[in-house]
Amino acid sequence: MTADEVGKNSFAKKEEQVLKFWKDNQIFEKSLQNRQGKTLYSFYDGPPFATGLPHYGHLLASTIKDVVGRYATMDGYYVPRRFGWDCHGVPVEYEVEKSLSLTAPGAIEDFGIASFNEECRKIVFRYVHEWEYYINRIGRWVDFSSTWKTMDASFMESVWWVFQSLYNQGLVYEGTKVVPFSTALGTPLSNFEASQNYKEVDDPSLVVRMPLQNDSASLLVWTTTPWTLPSNMAIAVGETLVYVRIQDKKSGEQWILSQGCVSRWFSNPEEFVILESFSGKDLVGRTYEPPFTFFQSKREEGAFRVIAASFVEESEGTGVVHMAPAFGEGDFLVCKENHVPLVCPVDAHGSFTEEIPQYQGQYIKHADKEIIKFLKKEGRIFYHGTVKHRYPFCWRTDTPLIYKAVNSWFVAVEKIKDKMLRANSSIHWVPEHIQEGRFGKWLEGARDWAISRNRYWGTPIPIWKSADGEILVVGSIRELEELTGTQITDIHRHFIDDLNIVKDGKPFHRIPYVFDCWFDSGAMPYAQNHYPFENQKETEEAFPADFIAEGLDQTRGWFYTLTVISAILFDRPAFRNAIVNGIILAEDGNKMSKRLNNYPSPKYVLDTYGADALRLYLLHSVVVKAEDLRFSDKGIEGVLKQILLPLTNVLSFFNTYAELYGFDPKSQDIEPAYTEIDQWILSNLYSVVGKVRESMSQYHLNFAVEPFVTFIDDLTNWYIRRCRRRFWEAEDTPDRRAAFSTLYEVLTVFCKVIAPFVPFLAEDIYQKLKLEKEPESVHLCDFPQVEMDKILPDLEKRMHDIREIVGLGHSLRKEHKLKVRQPLANFYVVGSKDRLSLLKTFEGLIAEELNVKNVIFYEEAPSFIYTTVKPNFRMLGKKVGSKMKEVQKALSELPNNAIDKLIQEETWVLTIDDREIALDGDDVVICRHTDPGYIARSSALFSVILDCQLREPLIVEGIARELVNKINTMRRNQQLHVSDRIALRIKTTEAVHRAFLDYENYICEETLIIAYDFTQDSDFQGENWDINGHATQIEITVSSIDS
């Protein structure tokens, strides 16, 4: 396969064929059947909403989940993979509201809750076919035939059981708290929902005068929320902070603020004078005039006083804090402690109520300008500017959140914090830092969870309440049927809101709330199986899950809610192992945006490059380590061309010559006569098996991918290249049989190693190689075991050194524009005695690989190369100080052998004036110098020198090799079969003609020429080539002459 074919979507087309093979032959189903009765490997899948299309984040998560599931299955486990759907909540409601224009306050109630909920039910699976297409197309195996849905009555009933269990443990309560609130949705949100969508915004920055009663001074109060000023109830100071009374020299006006904030607001000391200083404690209890008079009657209840608060700081503002207890969590708690009254003149949609007649009906953020205008007119504004800061936005509507005091139902998470931390300590996180970092810190700061929502399409909270406050919590459908005497088939709001319970003659009515949809997903381990009403054994055996995987944002979402509920119910984690992936960004580093069109569509990528390339690109990146990835389809194309295409070419190479020479793996009865390079590639193969197994046991997917990516390079750029002629041998020799047997074993084992990661290509390779009685699919095979008897560490080390030496030689040729096809005379290798003694048996291999006539090994550098060492002044300055000149002189006088020894030992100790100075590699700059005609390069272990002086015999041989290259290029371009013999016509210079004749046998054997003709015919129209500076025309035709 050529690079041109990459553009023809050949990989994607092959993948479509593999998908059909899997479907037609029910390979996924068979993979499950084959492991029935084996050890269960439990996996929980985070449910997506089907009201939106899948994006790269979903494809990434699907890839991670699929890799682990496929690997565990091949490793002998039974891995059920059941898909689930998140059906409730704001994402669904919001779509219906938009489509039906139900945006005005009260519009849903006017439309009818029953009608609204049924509309929600209709659109839940709007994009289910697209989801199934992308999940299947990415190669993920999952069971869509028995999906669970959060809107199913069975699921919702289990959620009720979970809630009743929490309530019975005394961990559910009703209360008023300040919580994140979405005015677009008219409902409170949880702390973790509020943390998901912070943005940089510009807000007003106001310093407001608050005149003290019975005093000529005003307190200077800073705020970024002018809309909260009508609700001001108190002012807070820090008891231990020092405050100052400042007087303006010109106007005589006096202000009070904290001493540490003076320079922020008074930059010119010539314009003011500090009259006195005192502690914050001295201000506590003082009264002041609020900026608005709407709640003057509250003064009698304790409003408009200065109170102390521990959170008051001097890092920003004035050290004097405006308190609106209904709109700040800290304000609420401190005001409650100090018996300051609570007012909340803002409705559920963020508009001022009739309590603020001046701005009644205005949306609070829109009222900011009017409020500032009024306060300026009243002379209350000391400073007006803007401030840029991070502010939370609603994760669904993308509108600013507010913090608002609301009545809500809470789970007392703070009471079970120790249980959650204990559960977290037993989870294996990838990456590891999530445990003590992002997730652990979130658990340490966990707040009580507001679980009630003033919404409609969700699981109703099963609380019935009497007029005197008595509560009944229902835990099952049967229990509700018995309490109401009604047969129940659905428990959504419009089916049960009107069901009243009468107990001991007292009526109970259901509270009008539904659960936060995160409560649904947190109950998923139990609710997916309708636990505890059925499937008890299966659910308990599968708990905790062996594995889950989601994005970094879920450390404050699904990972968190799973942990809260499992810690309460069972005092255990909900999962044992978790992979946390990062965020996929557009190539420019911004969020992917349809509006900005800054990323290629998933369908385009899958249709152009295929799923394997996308999977490997993602798995071989930082995104599987919870870091962000800038997505680039060029990166996917690189994976295709540099990793998958070379492996496909190896398969094509093997099949071509195996078919040509009739290689039959079943007929290989005796142990092949393996050469050292055969033993090396097999050793390398089984080392890779071990590395992949070890990495997968730790859930390090990127580490699992790395060794097999490197192995593909070893296989294609070393083993195949070094052994090509062995496969071309016309005679059936033991050496040819060993080469075929080796490569057959490599491909049949390696396709199983890569099967979890690139399942399509693995299947393609397997199908082209599998024997009749072997499993039907590579995914029905066992994952390879490590064959320790084939692992030869010393041989791998030696070959690594050889490749390093050859790599240095190739780098020299490339740097100095010396084609490898041009033979050179000598290649020198300088290294330690121990290493060189193991490499001398590979002298011929190095010579052939680098196209040199002689390879010479030296333990010390030869006379035509010398090394100098200079100080790295930037690094050495701190270490040697005034001794720099002496160090520079000592380094310049070191002889070659001493320098080589120091390089190998990687330690440098110089004695300057009886003082020992220890240097390391960063402290010096090593420079290699050679005589004219030689070029050199070094690594940590070796130095190599290439004799690049061209003599006549070498020039002639270079021409011959160039001819071979160009003729074989023409063979490939004309798509000749590897066995086709050809006739050659050539028009060229005398030098090329002479080189051809000198190397006739070599050229004819390498290109399968059986007849040739040199012509000077002026009408000859061959293909034009430059043969080392000689203009040449060449024509080749398939010859009919029997070879």
From Swiss-Prot:
Molecular function per GO: aminoacyl-tRNA deacylase activity; ATP binding; isoleucine-tRNA ligase activity; tRNA binding; zinc ion binding
Residue ranges of the TM segments: none
Keyword terms: Aminoacyl-tRNA synthetase, ATP-binding, Cytoplasm, Ligase, Metal-binding, Nucleotide-binding, Protein biosynthesis, Zinc
Role of this protein: Catalyzes the attachment of isoleucine to tRNA(Ile). As IleRS can inadvertently accommodate and process structurally similar amino acids such as valine, to avoid such errors it has two additional distinct tRNA(Ile)-dependent editing activities. One activity is designated as 'pretransfer' editing and involves the hydrolysis of activated Val-AMP. The other activity is designated 'posttransfer' editing and involves deacylation of mischarged Val-tRNA(Ile).
InterPro entries reported for this sequence: aa-tRNA-synth_I_CS, aa-tRNA-synth_Ia, Anticodon_Ile_ABEc, Ile-tRNA-ligase, Ile-tRNA-ligase_type2, M/V/L/I-tRNA-synth_anticd-bd, Rossmann-like_a/b/a_fold, tRNAsynth_Ia_anticodon-bd
EC supergroup of this enzyme: ligase
Protein name, per record: Isoleucine--tRNA ligase
Recorded domain comment: IleRS has two distinct active sites: one for aminoacylation and one for editing. The misactivated valine is translocated from the active site to the editing site, which sterically excludes the correctly activated isoleucine. The single editing site contains two valyl binding pockets, one specific for each substrate (Val-AMP or Val-tRNA(Ile)).
Family annotation (CDD domains): Anticodon_Ia_Ile_ABEc, IleRS_core
Catalytic activity line of the entry: tRNA(Ile) + L-isoleucine + ATP = L-isoleucyl-tRNA(Ile) + AMP + diphosphate
NCBIfam families linked: ileS
Subcellular location as annotated: Cytoplasm
Broad class of where this protein is predominantly found: cytoplasm
GO cellular component, one term: cytoplasm
Motif ('HIGH' region): 48-58
Lineage: superkingdom: Bacteria
One Pfam match: tRNA-synt_1
